[in-house]
């Protein structure tokens, strides 16, 4: 397993676990909001230096939508040695907001797939097990992966084996790189939402927050 040692991810991707078969039918029929265990995975690489305020705002908005039974953790990353678990699983919004507000930009080549794998491993091993609970990871990035040692096929296999869907909010002040994030989302049943300005960020976050809590 890749050791957590890094920064904050700039495309928000949410990994979402399917509910058990018997409960799935109930949830999908009713559209009921279910409790979720999820991780914020945030790119803190230098290419996002001018976007840090927007990234912090996006992550904070995701946290603010948490219900009383939702738990979350925060991972930031740049390259593989800088994948850092900034906040362990917690139900407390205040602890999550502190982790988000303390994010900072670092130099290095971005390793999206390695960060996703690390976060998925942590989620699957540490999420609370108490009946019908969804699992998710929120990835924030521009989608450019320059340094991962993990293969995308292997990462997708882990996500599918753990019934985790991926939702992405992609942002950049120059260019979005869709290849990796599109595949992660589409092959796990998630979506990619692109945020081009601060004005549309709230809508993107609301779309992800709603979908990660329902079937």
What are these regions (language model features)?
Residues 30-31, 64, 129:
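Short secondary-structure boundary/capping segments
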Residues 198-203:
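A short acidic, often aromatic-flanked loop/helix-cap motif at beta-alpha or helix-coil junctions
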Residues 2-4, 17-52, 89:
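Acidic, polar low-complexity linker/tail segments
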Residues 54-74:
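An active-site-proximal "capping" alpha-helix that borders the catalytic cofactor pocket
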Residues 24-25, 36-37, 45, 56-60, ...:
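Exposed acidic/Ser/Thr-rich ligand/metal-binding surfaces
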Residues 32-34, 66-68, 160:
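Solvent-exposed loop and beta-edge segments used for protein-protein assembly and interaction
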Residues 4-13:
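Sec-dependent N-terminal signal peptides
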């Amino acid at each position: 397993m890749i050791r957590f040692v890094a920064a904050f991810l700039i495309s928000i991707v949410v990994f979402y676990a399917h509910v058990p078969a018997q409960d799935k039918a109930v949830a999908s029929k009713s559209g009921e909001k279910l409790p979720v265990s999820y991780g914020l995975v945030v790119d803190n690489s230098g290419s996002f230096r001018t976007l840090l305020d927007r990234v912090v705002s996006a992550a904070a908005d995701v946290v603010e939508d948490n219900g009383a039974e939702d738990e979350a953790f925060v991972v930031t990353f740049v390259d593989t040695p800088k994948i850092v678990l900034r906040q362990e699983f917690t139900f407390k919004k205040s602890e999550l907001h502190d982790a988000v507000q303390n994010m900072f930009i670092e130099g290095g080549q971005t390793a999206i797939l390695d960060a996703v794998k690390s976060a998925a491993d942590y989620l699957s091993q540490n999420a609370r097990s108490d009946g019908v609970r969804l699992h998710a990871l929120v990835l924030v990035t521009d989608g450019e992966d320059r340094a991962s040692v993990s293969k995308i096929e292997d990462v997708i296999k882990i996500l599918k084996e753990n019934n985790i869907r991926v939702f992405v909010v992609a942002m950049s002040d120059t260019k979005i790189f869709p290849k990796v994030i599109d595949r992660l989302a589409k092959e796990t049943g998630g979506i990619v939402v692109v945020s081009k300005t601060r004005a549309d960020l709230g809508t993107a976050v609301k779309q992800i927050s709603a979908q990660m809590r329902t079937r």
